[in-house]
Design a protein with these regions (language model features):
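Class I S-adenosyl-L-methionine
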Residues: 1-240
């Protein structure tokens, strides 16, 4: 997907997309269709559209099916794009301690364009600790600030759920840099430690980035437990 990188329409802008921007998305691609719906809703910062799309399509290349759980979801576009990209997921939960009122506006606009979303999007305005995860979930979170990313990782690990996070706002006074500050800048060291800890626990880790012209906080950490081989048949079955 080509990015608009000119000064007038930078993908990193926090300006809201509105109907004035509809002409910038004329194609019949899924991204342009989503963008036109977002423009019509008139409530989403431009950078969130590009961030959600770039993260969702990378995660869906790795993880199919399962309930999608978008934690610290904000407007919830990430989770809903993931549902559009893979209709085998039964539903998406959008969870945030403080959901913006316009998250409902955006969800209704998306469901009007894609009726199959209707009834499959659940909002949970609750603290992160109160959200229950399941083993078959795909847990995603974009820019959960500081140690919130660590709490998202911890919850996914506890549930053995598939995980994708794109951290931001690293708190170097609290987060573990693994004594790597002499070689790496602080935020990168924190993310290296996060990935290394998951690997040490036996998780398969994939590290990627989205285009930096969208956000400087562009490191994407994707992880899952290896698939366990099927248990051998019972001794009785083997004797047969």
């Amino acid at each position: 997907m080509p990015l608009h990188t000119d000064d007038v329409f930078a993908p990193s802008s926090k300006a809201r997309l509105t109907t004035r921007d509809l002409g910038r998305f004329p194609e019949d691609t899924l991204f342009h269709r989503i963008a036109r719906v977002v423009c019509g809703a008139g409530c989403l910062p431009r950078k969130e559209l590009f961030e959600a799309w770039e993260v969702a399509r990378r995660v869906r290349r790795r993880f199919r099916g399962g309930r999608v759980v978008d934690l610290c979801a904000g407007h919830g576009l990430l989770g809903q794009i993931m549902l559009l990209l893979d209709d085998s997921s039964p539903e998406v939960m959008l969870a945030d301690p403080s959901l913006p009122p316009s998250s409902v506006t955006l969800s209704r606009a998306l469901a009007a364009e894609w009726p199959r979303l209707d009834g499959r999007v659940t909002f949970r305005e609750e603290p992160l600790d109160q959200i229950e995860l399941r083993k078959d979930d795909v847990v995603a979170s974009v820019h959960a600030c500081g140690t919130l990313t660590d709490r998202v990782i911890e919850k996914a690990v506890a549930a053995r759920a598939r995980l994708a996070v794109m951290p931001c706002c690293h708190n170097l006074d609290v987060s573990d840099t693994g004594a790597l500050g002499g070689w790496l800048d602080g935020p990168l060291a924190v993310d290296v430690v996060r990935a290394s800890r998951l690997r040490a626990m036996g998780w398969q880790v994939v590290t990627q980035t989205i285009p930096r012209e969208i956000t400087p906080h562009n490191r994407l950490l994707i992880a899952e437990l290896p698939r366990v081989a099927e248990e051998p048949s019972s001794p009785t079955a083997r004797r047969r």
